[in-house]
Swiss-Prot record:
Assigned GO CC terms: cytoplasm; methyltransferase complex; plasma membrane; vesicle membrane
Bilayer-crossing regions: 4-24, 60-80, 87-107, 140-160, 161-181, 234-254, 255-275
UniProt gene name: mtrE
Biological or metabolic pathway of the protein: One-carbon metabolism; methanogenesis from CO(2); methyl-coenzyme M from 5,10-methylene-5,6,7,8-tetrahydromethanopterin: step 2/2
Pfam families in the record: MtrE
Name of this chain's protein: Tetrahydromethanopterin S-methyltransferase subunit E
UniProt GO MF annotations: tetrahydromethanopterin S-methyltransferase activity
EC number(s) recorded for this UniProt protein: 7.2.1.4
HAMAP family, per database record: MtrE
Length: 295
């Protein structure tokens, strides 16, 4: 088979895995209030809003997912090389162990944060904590499995691949990357639209309203299940598309045009994206104008 066709097939598989991982990563951060919106949740009791929202951020998303993916990649690497387990099985076991560590940190972090807010009469809802562990572990498993999988594909002895870095290091690097993409792409949608639903959309989140979050859902008290259901319609898929496009566009040009041609085509793509982003922003500003205060 033509090496270029083989390489493009691997790149397509990597892009698909990255798309799934990106969507799951954003939804996991939404169900657990990780990264940017996290500070708004932990300020809510101080603003007089007692809530039933998970608040489990151990750290920022890049550091957290670099850790989870590094654990999964290290376990898979050992199982594949020491015990000669099949690749899929080794990666799955690594992702399960990473999900267990992830869940443990989620429990201790959430309980620690909520207990620290007890001086503001914020209770610890054990039923809410237990019910949300499944989505946290499940989405985390999908992210680490897909991320370690695309990292493994980079090490295949195929022209354009055969990366010199070992699998655990690649998994850490891609984990940091997917955490950064989820933090910069999906969290803006979550923080602006769902946590501050009582404010007009488009006005941003000024410091004066930090912690003044929405605590009532369409029926009953709002919890993180409501948030992740809402974000699955737009924020999650958008994050998956962003990460999938980054992975695909980072490899296909080298496979098709070679090293030198790939660098040149990559620069052209970056310039086109900058121009497109500028045109889109100018159009939006001219079409809708600046945000106006109510008179």
């Amino acid at each position: 088979m033509d090496p270029m066709i083989t390489g493009l097939g691997v790149v397509a598989l990597m892009g698909a895995a990255a798309t799934i991982a990106g969507a799951a990563e954003d939804l996991e951060s939404d169900v657990g209030s990780q990264s940017n919106p996290n500070s708004q949740v932990q300020l809510a009791p101080q603003m007089g809003h007692l809530h039933r929202i998970i608040n489990k951020a151990v750290s920022g998303e890049p550091v957290a997912y670099g850790t989870w993916c590094g654990i999964a990649g290290s376990v898979a690497f050992v199982l594949m090389n020491s015990m000669q387990l099949p690749v899929i099985m080794a990666i799955a076991i690594g992702a399960v162990i990473a999900a267990m560590v992830h869940t443990t940190y989620a429990v201790t972090s959430h309980m620690g944060r909520i207990v620290s807010q007890s001086q503001f009469n914020q209770p610890l809802f054990m039923d809410m904590l237990v019910q949300h562990l499944g989505p946290i572990a499940g989405h985390g498993f999908i992210v680490t499995f897909c991320t370690v999988g695309l990292s493994y594909l980079m090490t295949l002895p195929i022209p354009g691949f055969a990366h010199p870095f070992p699998l655990p290091l690649l998994a850490v690097l891609w984990g940091i990357t997917i955490g950064a993409i989820g933090s910069s792409t999906g969290d803006v949608h979550y923080g602006a639209e769902r946590e501050y639903q009582q404010y007009p959309f488009g006005g941003g989140i000024p410091v004066a309203i930090h912690g003044d979050i929405t605590t009532k859902a369409e029926l009953g008290a709002r919890n993180s299940m409501d948030v992740v259901h809402f974000c699955a319609k737009y924020g999650g898929p958008l994050t998956g598309f962003a990460f999938g496009a980054i992975v695909f566009l980072s490899f296909w040009n080298t496979i098709v045009f070679g090293i030198t041609g790939g660098i040149i085509s990559g620069l052209i793509i970056v310039l086109l994206l900058i121009i497109l982003n500028n045109r889109l922003e100018v159009f939006a500003r001219n079409r809708y104008g600046p945000y106006k205060e109510e008179e």
